[in-house]
């Protein structure tokens, strides 16, 4: 599921109650991060090292 953030900060593609968040994905522990957007429910799910914009990425 690909989400996008509109001008008012909402998203048209995420289910109700979920926010479209920027998060960082690292395929390995190299310190190289790729930034993407996805819905809150999938922010910590996947085969990669993922941190939400409201979580570890803010440190």
UniProtKB/Swiss-Prot annotation:
Give one GO molecular function term: ion channel regulator activity
Does the keyword Disulfide bond feature in the UniProt annotation?
A: yes
Record carries keyword Kinase: no
From the Swiss-Prot or TrEMBL record, state where the protein is found: Secreted
Record keywords, A-Z: Acetylcholine receptor inhibiting toxin, Disulfide bond, Ion channel impairing toxin, Neurotoxin, Postsynaptic neurotoxin, Secreted, Toxin
Cystine links in this protein are 3-20, 14-39, 43-51, 52-57
Listed under GO cellular component are: extracellular region
Gene3D superfamilies referenced in this protein's UniProt entry, alphabetically: CD59
Expressed, tissue-wise, as follows: Expressed by the venom gland.
- Family per UniProt? Belongs to the three-finger toxin family. Short-chain subfamily.
User: What is the role of the protein in this entry?
Assistant: Neurotoxin. Blocks muscular nicotinic acetylcholine receptors (nAChR).
Protein name per the record: Frontoxin II
**Which source organism does the UniProt entry give?**
Micrurus frontalis
Provide the taxonomic classification: Eukaryota, Metazoa, Chordata, Craniata, Vertebrata
């Amino acid at each position: 599921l690909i989400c996008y953030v509109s001008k008012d900060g909402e998203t048209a593609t995420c289910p109700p109650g979920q926010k479209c968040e920027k998060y960082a994905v690292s395929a390995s522990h190299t310190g190289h991060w790729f930034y993407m957007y996805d819905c809150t429910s999938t922010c910590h799910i996947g085969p990669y090292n993922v941190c939400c914009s409201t979580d570890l990425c803010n440190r």
